A protein has these predicted regions:
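Polytopic transmembrane helical bundles with strong interfacial aromatic enrichment
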Residues: 1-261
Length: 262
């Protein structure tokens, strides 16, 4: 197996998919940093083309800051923020969106070239194009998420939309890995179905579920509710776990239940 690995040379399609995976992973990390710095609502408009460039002069910065001052989050949490502080949070959100544009171009342009040059097998084109559509849809989902934090009296984005945005990001990453893995099967003997691969799939699904539950924790800021472990304020199952009606809402909207489930 080692000799096969040493002799193996990746083709251009595999390298392209590998770079795409790294960029998506970086995007997920940058998205987490954007959330932790409370920067996600700093850009109050969705401008896929016009938004490529950040504000280039002081007047433009002031204009963007004035837009931010109109949303509930500023009034509730950042009312003492100055222009310098706004530039910092703006940078995080702008960088997140910019990386999204880069991912789209890095995936789309080589895809077109590889299809024209027949580097991708005809029967696989649908799968590759499907991932491109997912990437495009993710941009729309991102704005759909952000817009929920600009409406009414909300000071945070919807936890449902946050979980959707994060969930789709990991689906894109998984699809890229699947395309990369199947582009040229390296070691057929270890790719056969066995009990280990079944357990790996189950574990992968559980990890994905945990990630989604974590998104609900982040969206509701439920992680701040209980600071004891393994008991939650002295109870294994926190009091009020099923306090919402209908009961299914507890899974997604009850802070105690959301933290316990995670």
């Amino acid at each position: 197996m080692k000799s096969k690995f040493l002799k193996y040379k990746a083709d251009k399609v595999e390298l392209w998919l590998y770079v795409s995976m790294l960029l998506v992973a970086a995007m997920i990390i940058l998205g987490g940093a954007t959330r932790l710095t409370n920067s996600g609502l700093s850009i109050t408009e969705w401008a896929p083309i016009k938004g490529i460039l950040p504000p280039l002069n002081n007047q433009s910065w002031v204009s963007e800051f004035e837009k931010y001052k109109l949303i509930p989050e500023f009034l509730a949490e950042h009312s003492d923020m100055d222009l310098s502080g706004f530039k910092t949070i703006y940078f995080w959100e702008w960088s997140h969106r910019q990386l999204g544009r880069i991912i789209g171009l890095v995936y789309a342009i080589p895809l077109i070239i590889f299809i024209i040059s027949k580097k991708i097998q005809k029967e696989k084109i649908f799968n590759f194009v499907g991932v491109l559509l997912l990437i495009c849809m993710q941009g729309i989902i991102g704005w759909w998420m952000v817009s929920s934090g600009l409406e009414n009296d909300r000071i945070d984005v919807s936890q449902y939309r946050l979980a959707t945005h994060l969930g789709v990001a990991f689906i894109i990453l998984a699809c890229l890995f699947w395309l990369w893995k199947n582009q040229k099967e390296r070691w057929p003997e270890i790719s056969k179905k066995n009990s280990l691969t079944r357990y790996t799939k189950i574990l992968t699904l559980l990890v994905y579920l945990q990630i989604i539950l974590g998104a609900f924790v982040a969206g509701l800021k439920a992680g701040r509710t209980y600071n004891t472990w393994p008991l939650m304020d002295g109870d294994f199952v926190p009091r009020g776990y099923m306090r919402l009606d209908p009961y299914w809402k507890n899974i997604f909207e009850n802070i105690s239940a959301v933290q316990f489930n995670h």
